[in-house]
Amino acid sequence: MTKKILLASLFIAFSFSVNAQSWWGNNKKVKGNGTIIIEKRTTSNYDAITIGGSFDVVLIKGTEGNITLKGEENIIPLIETEISGGTLKIKYKKNTNVKTTRRMVVTVTVSEIESIALGGSGNIISKTELISDDFSVSLGGSGNIELGINADETNVNIGGSGNIDLKGITNNLKCAIAGSGSIRAYNLTTSEINATIAGSGSVKATVKNKIKANLIGSGSIYYKGNPKQIDSKSIGSGSIIEKN
């Protein structure tokens, strides 16, 4: 149980860290003026992306470092796009409380990405397949992520009520959910899956060889395919369910 509590704490901390500036403190309150503009920015290369805020982020294939923001003219200047340790961080400036009246869309070019993280209620969708030896995606909060991937090993983590939709191919899928989030990956074919669920979350995947699961609570794993081996430990009403 300690591992699950630690997982939940880590994601709560992640979500808090990227959104805290909008919750407390002497924040500057800004409401969108409704006038839509487009701004282009450039950065150095990155191999990871972290999003903090209620943005709609679209990933497209291209040379890294080209970012396009489409949104309200008085809101866009409050969005930071910076590189730190090889990670592109997109978030609102500190001490700002932003209320948009129009959709805020950030388009990011990618070529080789190893990690994606979202904190809050935003959305990330990839229009290109993400290819990596070792890929990870993390979601803290109620946001949504949709990705197409081709990776040897894929790590997926959710803390909260968000959803992650995956399609593509991976050899080894490792999942961890703390809360009511869902990993929807029937369109992702994996040789093996190792999943830990603490709460009422769910994992859906297509598995060829092996399923290993640790379930605490009412969370369940739904699978398609014909895995040769299924190992499960459960405390609560959670279960592994075939959906062929």
Where are the regions that the model predicts?
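Intrinsically disordered, low-complexity terminal regions
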Residues: 1-244
